[in-house]
């Protein structure tokens, strides 16, 4: 059994008359070359009005936050497992 990093899933709340700046994807660039052992926590932001696809944000053990490419098979598996919970 592989040990997955701590994770949280946040589904966007539909904002009532929220500001237009909020209606965008957090992840404009993604990366797929990060090994899970370098990740201290993961956050999945579900798709919504602000962004058409789910976003996977990893916090590295160095404290840096990066967006992971959810098309990567390894990350897809992680997202699927997280969204099940």
Swiss-Prot record:
GO BP annotations listed: adenylate cyclase-activating G protein-coupled receptor signaling pathway; cytokine-mediated signaling pathway; defense response; immune response; leukocyte chemotaxis; negative regulation of angiogenesis; negative regulation of megakaryocyte differentiation; platelet activation
GO MF annotation terms: chemokine activity; CXCR3 chemokine receptor binding; heparin binding
Phosphoserine: residues bearing it: 41
Pfam families to which the protein is assigned, alphabetical: IL8
Record key words, sorted: Chemotaxis, Cytokine, Disulfide bond, Heparin-binding, Phosphoprotein, Secreted
Family annotation (InterPro entries): Chemokine_b/g/d, Chemokine_CXC, Chemokine_CXC_CS, Chemokine_IL8-like_dom, CXC_Chemokine_domain, Interleukin_8-like_sf
Organism domain of life: Eukaryota
Intrachain disulfide bonds: 25-51, 27-67
Gene Ontology CC annotations of this record: extracellular space
Subunit composition and interactions: Homotetramer. Interacts with TNFAIP6 (via Link domain). Interacts with CCR1. Interacts with CXCR3. Interacts with THBD; this interaction enhances generation of activated protein C.
Family: Belongs to the intercrine alpha (chemokine CxC) family.
Protein name: Platelet factor 4
The species this protein was found in: Ovis aries
Lineage: Eukaryota, Metazoa, Chordata, Craniata, Vertebrata
